Design a protein with these regions (language model features):
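Conserved phosphoryl-transfer catalytic core
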Residues: 270-298
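Core catalytic lobe of class I
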Residues: 1-264, 272-274, 294-299
Length: 299
């Protein structure tokens, strides 16, 4: 991929384990949502929960080698109820990645503001999914300022009811280990968000049964990928990560082993391209077929 291109997107059909080792460029960020364990078998290859950690970790080397030294990977993953209890494959998978050399930087929760209805005798509705942030180093690239949110009036309102030591509490005074000075929040226009991201499920059909909201990749791309950097989604599905990256002025590589999803994301990316002020994106849009090693350019 030519780094001088404006908002370039490359779509590749094939298995990331075979494709990524043959690519020369390094990426800044991997954002992806692997296939759900043992679900939606009619739509894509499904892995049994007992085999999931071994299966996903088989991509480890390809991911690790294509990522820059200060790069990150964000894995959106949902656990599964098996025989009435929650299977532990999610945590086994993350532990396995850490054993292979990755650092666990942060755990995020995608809070679904409109979870699917249903009834189960021993549990409630699933209203969240994991988003794990792993990195090759303990100090990956991060731009917290890019995701700060408005402070609002909560600091002033809270301080109005606090005085003296209630507003400024030091560790040495109560041995709580939680020192704080709420007065430091006064006057700040923007502050860091929490690690809980509240976003609705995607309601409309986008040619894929499990499309995460555009806000999810947008958040992580802003936070973990510099402008003009390269984002990779090795399980690209409907191309949602690609659309987010292009809108944020990043380059993107989308890989999927399902031909029908390649067609879906190609159509969606072309539609997004129409919204840009120039035709640069369309002109630079590549579709590569790894099996025949030919890059076909759209007109």
């Amino acid at each position: 991929m030519n780094r001088n291109r404006i908002n370039s997107c490359r779509i590749i059909h094939g298995d990331s384990r075979s494709i990524l080792p043959n690519m020369t460029e390094k990426v800044d960020l991997i954002v992806t949502s692997p296939p759900y364990a043992d679900a939606r078998k009619k739509h894509y290859d499904s892995i049994h929960p007992d085999e999931f950690s071994d299966w996903l970790s088989s991509f480890h080397k390809a991911f690790y080698e294509i990522l820059k030294p200060n790069g990150s990977i964000v894995i959106n993953i949902k656990d599964k109820i098996v025989d009435g209890t929650r299977h532990r494959f999610v945590w086994k998978t993350i532990e396995k990645f850490c054993e292979l050399g990755w650092y666990s930087i942060e755990d995020y929760i995608w809070h679904k503001t409109n979870p699917m209805p249903g009834y189960w005798p021993t549990r409630l509705r699933d209203g969240w999914e994991y988003c794990f942030h792993l990195a090759k180093s303990k100090s990956p690239y991060i731009n917290q300022a890019a995701v700060k949110i408005p402070t609002g009036k909560w600091a002033e309102v809270r301080l109005a009811n606090l005085t003296g030591k209630s507003a400024i509490r030091h560790n040495s005074e109560n041995n709580s280990g939680f020192g704080r000075d709420l007065t430091k929040w006064v006057g700040k226009e923007r502050v860091l968000p929490s690690n809980v991201l509240s976003l609705p499920l995607v309601g409309k059909n986008m040619g894929h049964p499990a499309v995460y909201p555009i806000g999810l990749p947008v958040f992580f791309i802003k936070l973990l990928c510099p402008e003009k950097g390269i984002v990779l989604d090795p399980f690209a599905g409907s191309g949602q990560t690609g659309i987010a990256a292009l809108q944020l002025n990043r380059n993107v590589i989308l890989v999927d082993n399902q031909r029908n999803y390649i067609e879906v994301m190609t159509k969606r990316i072309k539609e997004v391209a129409k919204n840009f002020s120039t035709q640069t994106l369309v002109d630079n849009f590549d579709i590569a077929s790894y099996q025949i090693n030919v890059v076909k350019k759209t007109p």
